């Protein structure tokens, strides 16, 4: 596969401090061998942070300087709303500072005074699971079995198992499932993509039982790319066209904009 030169220039760099073997040993000992206690400036290669670290364009930085800070009626909100509608097709938009806040808004609303309800997903991301359980719900992971085999090759290892989903609905009852979800791509499942057929099938099964279908859309563009390159019938479609179809099956979504929107904050 040939890769063209990047169509951009990098104008700003951030220095990263290097450490010696002995310095790293001292740091990990001081942290009690808990990597979450290590100061970030002591980390040379960060394999944990998965978002909010991409370089932003000159137009993005300029846009921050021209930002409308009006308490209501901000022109930036209307631009944000327009872009959400163009990509996702949803009329109602609530901006948040990151995805986990959007999750808490959703689950604190649908689970309020209704403890013990079940939220199925292919795999819940850790903040999604935390927000479900903090608000009294039960998070159920129903990813296909092959996803757990690291040596197996499959185009869409992020798919939800529709048989497991159907069994769960029969077991707990549709009235005890306020929404069903898909995370695209499947972050806690190794970032594996979800096929359009699986998205469509999930929507059809949930809607058959009058259960709303929501998408955790953090990496929707990457998922659309995998659909374009791996799923029959989508090679000639644009990423936007594929994204439009993905979300046409959903009743709503949450998203951290710190991933595929390539910004350092937002949701």
What are these regions (language model features)?
Residues 2-33, 37-39, 43-56, 60, ...:
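Conserved PLP-enzyme active-site core in the AAT-like
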Residues 63-65:
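Short, contiguous pre-domain boundary segments
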